[in-house]
């Protein structure tokens, strides 16, 4: 089945840009504000928001924008940030600038973990609210049943903490999105395939059984952020609802894919999430500026494809990735996967900045030849066994209530007055109504119920 077409000025004919991989495609929404790519961490800083513009150009050049619902996103509000982040920290972000940073009381910047990784740059607060607003807009489309899959490549900044930035991340858009989704979904699975451990998300939901956090990452105790060992499995009510897959340098395509599928499949069957949040950090690719894995673009995408195959609603966000040309290749390829389309290898002729993809101009360059694979078969099998043991402890999906008491509040600030009112109305419903609502959610596997 043919996809969209471009007009070839040489042959005077319409040429297909891609083909659909199946007769049915999910409803996919694509959330982006071009302004977010104009911010600048600094000349020598590895994080380059320009990668987002490059991604958007490539997505459009392949014609993918014609088969998705496109949304120009808004900025998140202060009250929305306060659903997770502390008031002191949000106030600091909203007021600090390169001009006044050195005039702040001694120790202020250090207290908020400002430094080389997380610098103060021009219009920092505007940047954080733009990428966060995109994730929250995507979340609303899922809540309102207007999207099956919602994409925000500018999001996925998984290191940010309640009171401080960390690892290039200032506001944790993932945590904020999940907190909103928990009002409508009993169980959410978070999957992170960034090179670095998704510590900020794990920390936020470490004591709840309603969010299962799963992270595949490099770990040796010293590699940033220094967390993500197999022993980190959650605590209190959330014990066994966090799972980490610590890997060594140089893991290859087959090893990664096989390990990923062998863990994700039984986890989904056991935990029975009603929605999946997928973080697609591109620094796990080979040849990344800060990377140490040997993954090719199609291998990374195979993980996304596998998660999608379960047919659950998905919020898909970006994350790390410090070689912009490969970041844009990956996220364009995965945009295609999420739309069930096959993209040709040749980069379209009409894309702006096409020279960035030279000299091969391929969507699928070979990226698997840089590092020695230090992940032995025994190591990977030991990790797999440990992970499956943790999954067996779940003993089936937890039964949950859908009221305010069951939304994680540890280390989370008060909700806005409007949201408190909504939750109060939910609490006033009878226990019988709540029970019926949960039974309906269990029967519908999607579990997507929007309260008006």
From Swiss-Prot:
Reaction catalysed by this enzyme: N(6)-acetyl-L-lysyl-[histone] + H2O = L-lysyl-[histone] + acetate
Main location: nucleus
Catalytic activity, EC: 3.5.1.98
UniProt-listed InterPro entries: HDAC_PDAC, His_deacetylse, His_deacetylse_1, His_deacetylse_dom, His_deacetylse_dom_sf, Ureohydrolase_dom_sf
Source taxon at top rank: Eukaryota
Residues annotated as the enzyme's active site: 197
Biased composition (Basic and acidic residues): 434-445
Similarity-based family: Belongs to the histone deacetylase family. HD type 1 subfamily.
Protein's name in the database: Probable histone deacetylase HOS2
Organism for this UniProt entry: Saccharomyces cerevisiae (strain ATCC 204508 / S288c)
